[in-house]
Amino acid sequence: MNLDIHCEQLSDARWTELLPLLQQYEVVRLDDCGLTEEHCKDIGSALRANPSLTELCLRTNELGDAGVHLVLQGLQSPTCKIQKLSLQNCSLTEAGCGVLPSTLRSLPTLRELHLSDNPLGDAGLRLLCEGLLDPQCHLEKLQLEYCRLTAASCEPLASVLRATRALKELTVSNNDIGEAGARVLGQGLADSACQLETLRLENCGLTPANCKDLCGIVASQASLRELDLGSNGLGDAGIAELCPGLLSPASRLKTLWLWECDITASGCRDLCRVLQAKETLKELSLAGNKLGDEGARLLCESLLQPGCQLESLWVKSCSLTAACCQHVSLMLTQNKHLLELQLSSNKLGDSGIQELCQALSQPGTTLRVLCLGDCEVTNSGCSSLASLLLANRSLRELDLSNNCVGDPGVLQLLGSLEQPGCALEQLVLYDTYWTEEVEDRLQALEGSKPGLRVIS
């Protein structure tokens, strides 16, 4: 049984009503409920009486160090079997981290710990790592985004990676560890004992110099499946250093996120060699890089090669124009693996959209998710999209948010959605406005097709 409450300021009466449930439910989520240290006394008592609890989520509550201490004391019961604990954005500071080593030691069932958005600092991180190094700790997932960590935190983290095979997922994104810190962390990642599967280092101040170390890591660590390096200034030079590791026979990477990494069409050439050779790579994000139409052409040519089995490609905000759509269209008619294509925030216009729709209307196309938000689509472009919805049997999600579409365009789309042969399940229209007449027709459509969601 789950107790799941979000964004509700709990009155005294409501809190009294909930307390008995805290002692019974397997999953308790009280996110952004205005909880404070005073509530934590009750929470701790309730947790001691609940041997069934497997997940506790108290995100975005002003618990403070003292409140978190009370909650953790409640979990340190011999009968506690908690597996997932989320204390994200709970005002936990370095001063409150002293209890973490004993907590991790006493909770051998704990597998996930979320501490993001707490100012732990390097000193708090060191205390956390003491607990992670305990033989009784079997944590598998650790999230530490926005924790005010610096390069000084990387040696303790590297020690954990060298010492435990249990940890599978580590997120340290949005911390200023910099080039030097990433190099130290890489030493732990390269250790043979490290069995990490997911590493997230987004917006960590990495530079092209770090990519040589990362190359060695992805080449040698067959366990690594997901690598997130977004919002780091790697540049084309860094990508050139990284790609030989991705091409290694030992690399089994499935997901690679390189959004906003200062990559151009030149960097695409190196990545394309990886796409053509690595059937294991399934997801690639290059969003926010100035690839241009030339970069798009190179990617599409790679997606036509038999060695490429990519399933998801994000090229949002990549300085693409309608000129790239001929290459994208050809790829869509021949590629049978790509299921998701994110093209939002590119100046494709109605002419580009028309070309894409003609391709996707061909029999045998397999794309399921198409994102065209902020692509300068007008009511005229909706005519092509409406025809596509009737011709295509594979497309399930379409995002047209933030385009110049009004009643005429929306009505064309609704006309197709109303047809029994339309297979679309989700249409996203954020920042799109229509009249009450169109709204009435939309509500009637959702009532007659319960499997369809229109999100606006």
From Swiss-Prot:
The modification N-acetylmethionine is found at M1. One of its GO terms (biological process) is cell migration. It is found in: Cytoplasm; Nucleus. Pfam families: LRR_6 (PF13516), LRR_RI_capping (PF18779). One of its GO terms (molecular function) is ribonuclease inhibitor activity. LRR repeats lie at residues 15-43, 44-71, 72-100, 101-128, 129-157, 158-185, 186-214, 215-242, 243-271, 272-299, 300-328, 329-356, 357-385, 386-413, 414-442. Its main location: cytoplasm. The modification Phosphoserine is found at S86. Gene3D superfamilies: Ribonuclease Inhibitor. InterPro entries: Leu-rich_rpt, Leu-rich_rpt_Cys-con_subtyp, LRR_dom_sf, LRR_RI_cap, NLRP_innate_immun_reg. GO terms for cellular component: angiogenin-PRI complex; cytoplasm; lamellipodium; nucleoplasm; nucleus; plasma membrane. The keyword Cell membrane does not apply. The keyword Cytoplasm applies. Keywords: Acetylation, Cytoplasm, Leucine-rich repeat, Nucleus, Phosphoprotein, Repeat. Ribonuclease inhibitor which inhibits RNASE1, RNASE2 and angiogenin (ANG). May play a role in redox homeostasis. Required to inhibit the cytotoxic tRNA ribonuclease activity of ANG in the cytoplasm in absence of stress. Relocates to the nucleus in response to stress, relieving inhibition of ANG in the cytoplasm, and inhibiting the angiogenic activity of ANG in the nucleus. The LRR domain forms a horseshoe-shaped structure that interacts tightly with target RNases via a large protein interaction surface on its interior side. Forms high-affinity heterodimers with RNASE1, ANG and RNASE2. This is Ribonuclease inhibitor. It comes from Sus scrofa (Pig). The lineage of its organism: Eukaryota, Metazoa, Chordata, Craniata, Vertebrata. The gene is RNH1.
